[in-house]
């Protein structure tokens, strides 16, 4: 199968699962968005080996065609701490951190632009399946501040570390408990990465999206917690990357880390 044939196979498989028949769009980009939407909406359940094989070929080819960044390519650093602006799904670190929700199953909203959706969409349906197995095994939702590690599947990283950050109601102040919970997120991820003897981990901006944690406050907590961890622990980690997407977050982290 060529790229277009694989795309149509994946779409038709997921539509058949839903017992739906729709007019498939004509252009590749529209069909690609449809596939992502169907993947986003799919609840964890058994899926054929043929689907997974074709999905993996399709997604791994997409990943290979992206402008990937290795940890060694990141120039803005201070000791073990690094700052990078870009799409976390293009970063070849040992692990990337996903700001998850308590169900740990990814975002089910089609084409939503949250980090949880973006990571699951690029990784493939196996990521949701693995997360579901962990949630079923523990018998309930994931607590705020804890961390779980999974394979990264079709991402350039080796692992994804999932953590649930604190959520702030709009208009409410950040409490001392919220601060402790966010600190715990970073510590849990760093402890887990060290347990797995990883060399590098890339953090997204935990809780600052739909969870409404103020960006500057969150950055201050993130940087302080990482520095405290490095000062207090023996760790395999040599590269801890703060990955930001927006210019505003980049400016905040750059000023806090480097003073300019």
UniProtKB/Swiss-Prot annotation:
Domain called Macro: residue spans: 68-260
Cofactor: binding comment: Binds 1 Zn(2+) ion per subunit.
Gene3D superfamilies in alphabetical order: Leucine Aminopeptidase, subunit E, domain 1
Catalytic reaction annotation: 5-O-(ADP-D-ribosyl)-L-glutamyl-[protein] + H2O = L-glutamyl-[protein] + ADP-D-ribose + H(+)
Sorted UniProt keywords: Glycosidase, Hydrolase, Metal-binding, Zinc
Group of enzyme by EC: hydrolase
Cofactor(s) essential for the protein: Zn(2+)
InterPro entries: Macro_dom, Macro_dom-like
Domain of life where this protein originates: Archaea
Protein residues bound to ADP-D-ribose: 87-88, 101, 115-116, 207-211
Signal peptide: none
Residues where Zn(2+) binds: 107, 112, 114
EC id: 3.2.1.-
Pfam families tied to this protein: Macro
One of the record's GO molecular function terms: metal ion binding
The keyword Kinase appears for this protein: no
Similarity-based family: Belongs to the MacroD-type family. Zn-Macro subfamily.
Oligomer and partners: Monomer.
Functional description taken from the UniProt entry: ADP-ribosylhydrolase that hydrolyzes ADP-ribosyl-glutamate bonds. In vitro, it can remove the ADP-ribosyl modification from the human mono-ADP-ribosylated PARP1 E988Q mutant, which is primarily modified on glutamate site with only minor aspartate contribution. It cannot hydrolyze the ADP-ribosyl-aspartate bond of ribosylated S.pyogenes GcvH-L.
Annotated protein name in UniProt: Protein-ADP-ribose hydrolase
Organism for this UniProt entry: Methanobrevibacter oralis
Lineage: Archaea, Methanobacteriati, Methanobacteriota, Methanomada group, Methanobacteria
